[in-house]
C-alpha cells in the first residue's frame, strides 16, 4: 500500500504543479518545461525510495516489460497514477475557479496545429527518448542512482520544451487523462493519442534498453 500511495502522491505533485503552471504561465515554454522537470525531480527524491518513482503509466509499462516490477504491482501503480492525476486536475480546476479564469484552461494536452498521425509520432518519439534516459540512468549495471532524479527531471524539461507547441508535451498518459476528463472537447476526443503513443514509445525503449545491456 505504501508503494501505491507514493505513486499517487508523486503523480499528483507532477500533474498539479505542471498543469497549474501551464494555466498561469500563459504559453511560456521555458517556465512550463521547467515546472514539469522540477516537479518530477522533487517527486523522485521524495517518493522514489518507496515506489521506484514511476509517476507515469508508460514508465511502469517499460519496467514491467524489463521485469523490474511484477504485473500485480504494475496494475496497482497505474491505477494509483491515474487517480493521482485526476485528483490533481480537480484541484487545478478549483484553483482556476478561484482565480476567475476560464474553466476550460486546465493544462490539458491537444494538437490543434498538426494532424493526429504527426502528434502520435511526436509523443511516441519524446516518450521513447525519455524512457531511454530513465532505463539507463536507473540501470543496476551502469546507472547512477545518486543523480537519477535530477537527470530525469532535466530530460523531461527539455523534451516538453521541444514538444510543447506541437502536442503539449505529455509523455505521460496519466498527465493527459486527468485534465481531459474535466476539460472535455478535443482534449478528450484526442486522448487516445496521449494514451497509446507514450505506451508505444515506452515499449520500444524497453526493448532497446535490453539490446544496450541496461537490463542484464
From Swiss-Prot:
<feature type="short sequence motif" description="NPA 1">
    <location>
        <begin position="56"/>
        <end position="58"/>
    </location>
</feature>
<dbReference type="GO" id="GO:0015250">
    <property type="term" value="F:water channel activity"/>
</dbReference>
<protein>
    <recommendedName>
        <fullName>Glycerol uptake facilitator protein-like 6</fullName>
    </recommendedName>
</protein>
<keyword id="KW-0472">Membrane</keyword>
<feature type="transmembrane region" description="Helical">
    <location>
        <begin position="30"/>
        <end position="50"/>
    </location>
</feature>
<dbReference type="InterPro" id="IPR034294">
    <property type="entry name" value="Aquaporin_transptr"/>
</dbReference>
<keyword id="KW-0812">Transmembrane</keyword>
<feature type="transmembrane region" description="Helical">
    <location>
        <begin position="72"/>
        <end position="92"/>
    </location>
</feature>
<dbReference type="InterPro" id="IPR023271">
    <property type="entry name" value="Aquaporin-like"/>
</dbReference>
<dbReference type="InterPro" id="IPR000425">
    <property type="entry name" value="MIP"/>
</dbReference>
<comment type="similarity">
    <text>Belongs to the MIP/aquaporin (TC 1.A.8) family.</text>
</comment>
<keyword id="KW-1133">Transmembrane helix</keyword>
<feature type="transmembrane region" description="Helical">
    <location>
        <begin position="147"/>
        <end position="167"/>
    </location>
</feature>
<dbReference type="Pfam" id="PF00230">
    <property type="entry name" value="MIP"/>
</dbReference>
<feature type="transmembrane region" description="Helical">
    <location>
        <begin position="5"/>
        <end position="25"/>
    </location>
</feature>
<comment type="function">
    <text>Probable transporter that facilitates the transmembrane diffusion of an unknown substrate. Is not permeable to water, dihydroxyacetone, glycerol, urea, H(2)O(2) and D/L-lactic acid.</text>
</comment>
<dbReference type="GO" id="GO:0005886">
    <property type="term" value="C:plasma membrane"/>
</dbReference>
<feature type="transmembrane region" description="Helical">
    <location>
        <begin position="114"/>
        <end position="134"/>
    </location>
</feature>
<feature type="short sequence motif" description="NPA 2">
    <location>
        <begin position="172"/>
        <end position="174"/>
    </location>
</feature>
<feature type="transmembrane region" description="Helical">
    <location>
        <begin position="191"/>
        <end position="213"/>
    </location>
</feature>
<keyword id="KW-0813">Transport</keyword>
<keyword id="KW-1003">Cell membrane</keyword>
Amino acid at each position: 500500500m505504501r508503494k501505491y500511495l507514493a505513486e499517487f502522491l508523486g503523480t499528483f505533485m507532477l500533474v498539479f504543479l505542471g498543469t497549474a503552471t501551464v494555466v498561469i504561465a500563459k504559453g511560456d515554454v521555458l517556465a512550463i518545461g521547467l515546472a514539469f522537470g522540477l516537479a518530477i525531480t522533487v517527486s523522485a527524491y521524495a517518493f522514489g525510495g518507496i515506489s521506484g518513482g514511476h509517476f507515469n503509466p508508460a514508465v511502469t509499462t517499460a519496467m514491467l516489460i524489463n521485469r523490474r516490477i511484477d504485473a500485480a504491482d504494475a496494475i496497482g501503480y497505474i491505477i494509483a497514477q491515474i487517480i493521482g492525476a485526476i485528483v490533481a486536475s480537480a484541484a487545478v480546476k478549483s484553483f482556476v475557479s478561484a482565480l476567475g479564469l476560464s474553466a476550460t484552461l486546465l493544462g490539458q494536452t491537444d494538437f490543434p496545429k498538426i494532424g493526429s498521425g504527426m502528434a502520435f509520432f511526436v509523443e511516441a518519439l519524446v516518450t521513447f527518448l525519455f524512457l531511454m534516459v530513465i532505463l539507463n540512468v536507473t540501470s543496476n549495471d551502469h546507472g547512477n542512482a545518486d543523480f537519477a532524479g535530477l537527470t530525469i527531471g532535466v530530460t523531461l524539461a527539455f523534451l516538453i520544451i521541444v514538444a510543447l507547441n506541437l502536442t503539449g508535451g505529455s509523455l505521460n498518459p496519466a498527465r493527459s487523462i486527468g485534465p481531459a476528463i474535466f476539460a472535455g472537447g478535443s482534449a478528450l476526443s484526442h486522448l487516445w493519442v496521449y494514451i497509446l503513443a507514450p505506451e508505444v514509445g515506452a515499449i520500444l525503449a524497453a526493448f532497446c534498453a535490453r539490446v544496450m545491456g541496461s537490463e542484464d
